[in-house]
Swiss-Prot record:
This is 5'(3')-deoxyribonucleotidase, mitochondrial. Belongs to the 5'(3')-deoxyribonucleotidase family. PANTHER family: 5'(3')-DEOXYRIBONUCLEOTIDASE (PTHR16504), 5'(3')-DEOXYRIBONUCLEOTIDASE, MITOCHONDRIAL (PTHR16504:SF6). It is found in: Mitochondrion. Gene3D superfamilies: Deoxyribonucleotidase, domain 2, HAD superfamily/HAD-like. It comes from Homo sapiens (Human). GO terms for cellular component: mitochondrial matrix; mitochondrion. Highly expressed in heart, brain and skeletal muscle. Detected at very low levels in kidney and pancreas. Its EC number is 3.1.3.-. Homodimer. The gene is NT5M. Keywords: Hydrolase, Magnesium, Metal-binding, Mitochondrion, Nucleotide metabolism, Nucleotide-binding, Transit peptide. Mg(2+) binds at D41, D43, D176.
Amino acid sequence: MIRLGGWCARRLCSAAVPAGRRGAAGGLGLAGGRALRVLVDMDGVLADFEGGFLRKFRARFPDQPFIALEDRRGFWVSEQYGRLRPGLSEKAISIWESKNFFFELEPLPGAVEAVKEMASLQNTDVFICTSPIKMFKYCPYEKYAWVEKYFGPDFLEQIVLTRDKTVVSADLLIDDRPDITGAEPTPSWEHVLFTACHNQHLQLQPPRRRLHSWADDWKAILDSKRPC
């Protein structure tokens, strides 16, 4: 059951409490070092944005051309649809601006289980870091509702809503967007590209690396950022 009435007044005023198991020093690991901080993107990493969009687009506009997932190229869905036919960009945007779009997205395979396990690791703080769309009538609320549905109410403290992820301090950012820019030219985090239909064809230059899916060895990526 979604219990969002309470947190609107209560949780947003409280300080975030990291999800990982901490030492007694409020964020320090058991050996006295700082906990590893991991940011996990939501759409395309936890929630199946691309699949959810395509299903709803085809249902609402059955007579319009569409782009199969294997043919998706580029992060911005609306741009590729706009090149396909005039007017399709606006139709695409109308899908994710609609009520319940974000809430009804299905989790990607293994995503919920992996992030719950990640958050339970010693000396590890996990935050869901997501950028709401500018048409904010439904999106921010539904993102919170989605997290509560799949991760439970306590994980609401672990959400970071921001249009600029470069200003958020962390060790790792797992995100499907290939190019993440903002006010901070040198973010503190390493960007690990999560493989999605729109970016799977890209060749990354070392030292950049991917997480191909939640069945991939995400623990090894985290361990590579921990002190020896």
